[in-house]
């Protein structure tokens, strides 16, 4: 065989190998913070519109068994990406969990302290001596403690209600719950005929923060930086698409999540739309301000340098 012929054979083999490997999508498992709802709509829209596929990503979306599962599973590398909360990641970082925050889904607080109207609750001080539920252990109970300190609530009983927000309130098991979103559980309660009130945390002393964020384990990030950068690009693109085409985006969501309650999710989407992240890059200064607040009010017991957990690369 001549040298020229050998060269041509090698070229053909190289092209064949390149073609067979280049089309393989990177498979990622994403765990939600909660059951699927319109907070997560841009992710489902991205999948429906083929935005992930265009970046050669294949996303498997799963729901947590318990409200505190997502962060731990991502930090340990058992899933690739988790949706978490800014306060939760700062608390976890102070406790030594290794993770990287690399994107945002909801850029301002949605969390409230929710209660039924007609219970004599007008100001936070009226919660003195009450039974207050919380949704996410290790997060909402800690935020509740800070809220109580800020608003001079000296005595209350904290009760873990997990996912059972509506049932706990309507059955009288608790007088209020820390953790419901002003864009979602308020809608659910209204549709079930209950009038509710709520305290927005940022209006009662808690600093502004990113409600829903994307995190991954430190080892996962070290291995898949380009993949995570691609994921961020997709989320940015999906949110822009949702803002420009809200009605079609909602239709895409219902096709992806056919079991969703259409009435509730439609009304909740209208309230949620303004809160989707305007960009993926995280504000280190804003994050540090919250971390400093967390140390001052006992959410954490040692200082966290947020630059050590935030991925600020623009890609």
Which stretches of residues belong to each language-model region?
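Short, glycine-/small- and polar/acidic-enriched structural segments
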Residues: 27-162, 166-171, 175-183, 198, ...
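Pocket-lining segment of extracytoplasmic ligand-binding domains
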Residues: 87, 163-256
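Bacterial N-terminal signal peptides
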Residues: 8-18
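Conserved C-terminal helix/tail region of periplasmic/extracytoplasmic solute-binding proteins
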Residues: 292-315
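Secondary-structure end/capping motifs
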Residues: 222-299
């Amino acid at each position: 065989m001549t040298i020229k012929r050998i060269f041509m054979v090698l070229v053909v083999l190289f092209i064949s190998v390149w073609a067979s490997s280049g089309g393989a999508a990177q498979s990622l498992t994403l765990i939600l913070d909660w059951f699927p709802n319109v907070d997560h709509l841009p992710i489902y829209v991205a999948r429906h519109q083929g935005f992930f596929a265009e970046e050669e990503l294949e996303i498997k979306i799963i729901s947590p068994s318990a409200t505190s599962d997502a962060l731990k599973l991502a930090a340990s590398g058992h899933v690739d990406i988790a949706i978490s909360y800014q306060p939760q990641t700062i608390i976890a970082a102070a406790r030594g969990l290794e993770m990287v925050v690399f994107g945002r889904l909801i850029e301002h607080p949605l969390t409230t302290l929710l209660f039924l109207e007609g219970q004599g609750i007008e100001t936070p001080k009226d919660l003195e001596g009450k039974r207050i539920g919380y949704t996410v252990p290790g997060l909402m109970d800690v935020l509740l403690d800070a809220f109580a300190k800020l608003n001079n609530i000296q005595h209350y009983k904290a009760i873990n209600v997990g996912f059972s927000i509506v049932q706990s309130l309507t059955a009288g098991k608790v007088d209020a719950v820390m953790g419901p979103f002003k864009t979602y559980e308020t809608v659910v309660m209204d549709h079930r005929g209950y009038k509710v009130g709520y305290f927005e945390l940022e209006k009662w002393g808690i600093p502004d923060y990113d409600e829903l964020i994307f995190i991954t384990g430190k080892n996962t990030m070290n291995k898949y930086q380009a993949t995570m950068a691609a994921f961020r690009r997709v989320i940015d693109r999906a949110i822009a698409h949702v803002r420009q085409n809200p009605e079609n985006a909602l239709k895409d969501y219902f096709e992806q999540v056919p079991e969703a309650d259409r009435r509730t999710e439609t009304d909740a989407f209208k309230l949620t739309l303004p809160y989707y992240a305007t960009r993926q890059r995280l504000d280190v200064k804003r994050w540090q301000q919250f971390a400093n607040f967390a140390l001052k009010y006992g959410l954490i017991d040692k200082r966290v340098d947020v630059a050590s957990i935030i991925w600020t690369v623009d890609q």
